């Protein structure tokens, strides 16, 4: 692996574009539209935030863009990183190099798109871009950024070229981002990658300059994102959207002849196409993902492996999959030894692999999905069977789900009949995906609602919140107490599926997904208690209070109130703006009631 880069491609450089690139910027192009459940009163934003420095807008969407080529002497090499000031460690560059190319056995001729995910190096500062951090709180939990990971979105081209020593042109254009917007970034690559391979670095620089003019990725706003003559109209979902709804952004009447290509999502994959070979076992796979079981997808190419892994992770939405997952994983990955060791039980992770070597290396894993080539939309492959793990010897083994897992729930025959009928009637894959996604959503909601109801009961009563005492603690989660609630308020109220729901819950309570979910809910509820405590303080007559207390106690109160304000701002507590303003007014009034020497000191201490 090596790093090479043209000196002229620095962050401040403005290289002249050739005529072809200039033409690309000026020509009329289709407008791409993506949506995610937009309410009618959505604001639109096609301007860039004020006061931003060069590359700040770019950094809100992308960490960097890489070009990875093949060098006969060096192997896969990062040829360009843009903007040039972007920081990647040597370990990260090595991972990007190997993950940006299909394994040689994949035989991917032509253009191939896929996605990978890799761990950020431990030696670098782990932080989110300030803009991302600001908007993260409004995202659904499954779209929140994980500061420890990057996503890589790849457009790989391999074509015969007799002028090259190797006989093939092999190159990948890779977008590196914190954002898990799979469908959106794949669409961006479809627009820019083919022309980049013809026009090279000047075209890439122009595309990056366009991205740097984009507005910030604000959830809930309709955003206009121009790139190389194409305008994308997108809406990022918010945590307030109703789960499972995808209302297309309404197009305004346009006087020009732009063609609109509508993308109904920024992050979802074609879930039916991915589950198609195994949809008879989709409910069992849902259980395995829900429970955070070690799962490996063996596929013929990175496209199939990455799409299938992402579909699996997505099938428990709106619940977030809290364990690690790798849409495309290679033997060169820096976590290869960690994830393939036999000295301990396989970790809670979903891996997508294509190298035959993994059939032997991972044969001790308890659950393996072996899939063949995914069929084009509208076709359905032969359904694979559940097979014993001992029958899996090589990656050439027949497609199937290799596991000895016994599902807790009885199989829902209704959804299978519905999907099979759709296949017979040649129902479009998009419609099949809507049916399957709704089925998974209802299944997940039936499972999670009893947990949500019980956890809500752990919240102290509002009347127990005193402004002069610390906020009360949440009651402890007691598994047996929760189990007793299932008799009257269990999933049988909302789901037709029978089976051992109690056993499924007991297993789930020991899983990483429960741990992550409960920590998230506990944090939200603790923040709600802090917000209610602030509101209780605001309702008090603090000037009357200080008349009955000493100067020392009053100064202590001011400092505590200032800390409360800082905490509310830092942790994005769900506090109403007028509550914050009221508290600032209280603080100012208390300070003015103190002697002048103390006023000067307190006004300098922190911000009011």
Swiss-Prot record:
Name the record gives this protein: Protein DENND6A
Region (Disordered): 1-48
Domain dDENN, chain residue ranges per copy: 395-528
GO cellular component assignments: cytoplasm; cytosol; intracellular membrane-bounded organelle; recycling endosome
Biological role stated in the UniProt entry: Guanine nucleotide exchange factor (GEF) for RAB14. Component of an endocytic recycling pathway that is required for the control of ADAM10 transport, shedding of N-cadherin/CDH2 by ADAM9 or ADAM10 and regulation of cell-cell junctions. Required for RAB14 recruitment to recycling endosomes.
PROSITE patterns linked: DENN
Gene Ontology process terms (BP): positive regulation of cell-cell adhesion mediated by cadherin
TM region positions: none
Gene: DENND6A
Modified residues (N6-methyllysine): 510
Subcellular location: Recycling endosome; Cytoplasm
GO terms assigned for molecular function: guanyl-nucleotide exchange factor activity
Domain of life: Eukaryota
Family: Belongs to the DENND6 family.
Keywords: Cytoplasm, Endosome, Guanine-nucleotide releasing factor, Methylation, Phosphoprotein
Domain uDENN intervals: 63-247
InterPro entries: ABL9/DENND6_dom, DENND6, Tripartite_DENN
Keyword ATP-binding among UniProt keywords: no
Residues that bear Phosphoserine: 127
Residue ranges occupied by any cDENN domain in the UniProt entry: 273-393
Native source species: Homo sapiens
